[in-house]
Amino acid sequence: QLPIDMAVAHAGPWPVPGGTADDDIYAIYTSGSTGRPKGVQVRHRNVANLIETLRTSPGMGEGDVVLALTTLSFDIAVCELLLPLATGATVWLAGREDAADPDRLRALLSTHRVDVMQATPAAWRMLLDAGWQGDMALRAWCGGEALPADLAAALLPRVGALWNVYGPTETTVGSSRHRASAVDGPVPIGQPLQNTQFHVLDARGTEVPIGVVGELCIGGEGVARGYLGRPELTAGRFIDGGTLGRLYRTGDLGRWRNDGTLECLGRNDFQLKIRGYRIEAGEVEHVLLAHPAVARAVVVGRPAPGGETRLLAYVVPHPGADIEEETLRAHVAQRLPSYMVPQRCLALPTLPLTTSGKIDRNALPAPQDAIVRTSAAAPASGNDMLLDPDEARVAALFRELLALPQVDRDADFFSLGGHSLLAAQLAARLGRALDHQIPMRAVFDHPTIGRLAAWLASRTQDAAAVIPRLGAETPAPLSVMQQ
């Protein structure tokens, strides 16, 4: 509270805090390879440049309705909140459950007549798997991770425009964009935003010709200040490019195409993109090694059905130690966000090595070939060999979505690596198979094959018992008392 005498004594105008375009507007944290997250310092000028480009291309203005799905801890929320505020658009905020439930998401899109929605490829695929037919008035923005060609082909006939947006947090949300058209191969990341330059460099820092692969480095107005309180790390990633100016080394491989657009070819280090979030494999490894039973650990990303990346952890136990998969996943879940919890934690007697003595990540066995000490993924216990038709249907979807050759009847969907997006796909596919709407909540409430199949059977019986509605022209039968 301000004392009255101070307020009276202050006769002049109240001072306005000074600020410049070079001041920080926010700091947002990304995964760090040593287990310590990195705080990216983004300046006002960085965000202003982003807004000035995106308001015209892809485009957003007064009269547009934007559906915001993203948590504030994910930097693309800038496009869902600050960009609409700067352009006069209307923002509808989706709740956490709305964003994870395709049926609720479809209802929001329809009810609010949304013009612009930005989401990760996993979220767009979740909508399509739930039977969403699209909206030709919708401008779909896709970012956070690579846009698979098959997903782009499925979205194009269902939306008015499909934009692929690319850029790391260190260059302020987005650095390039591309309006997708006919898909005949990898979807390019397009051309740089205004006042932004892309350079494809070789190991010596020299620009490579068109078509040659190199590291994508970004310069211009989008480049952030650096990492908060991490001068050495800042110096390693934000470099002096000489005549090219100050550059950020993305760690992504890419090349220029003959049509003047850029193509991103993935990482050249151990960073991964999981459900739109960029993570350092080393951060997850650091947490695993803190478990008393773990002697060595390595974390990798492997392709999963639907174009997603599945996070797998391989561990070597200390001599005499017993490792259970569920215990390791719980250990990580207590210390890291849910998207950084490995879908599988697999025990090996040793880690494969290259001739130079480094871990050979390409030689790590597929999950079904590894030694797994866990009750949830133990060998089939006999009762899964006697599945009824309902259980067999659920079991087949468990195996497909989790990319597992065998799933026990009593194994928990989420202990085996399931997450909310996969749960939404499971509910949608079961709903199509049974011709009933299956809420995603059912998977959380009944996460095993046996329990979910029993719930589905009871729901089907309840649906069959519903009295059919008669048309207005059909006479209703009289009850005994009425007769």
Language model features: what each stretch is:
Residues 120, 220, 252, 419, ...:
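Short, conserved phosphate/pyrophosphate- and ester-handling motifs at nucleotide-, phospho-/glycolipid
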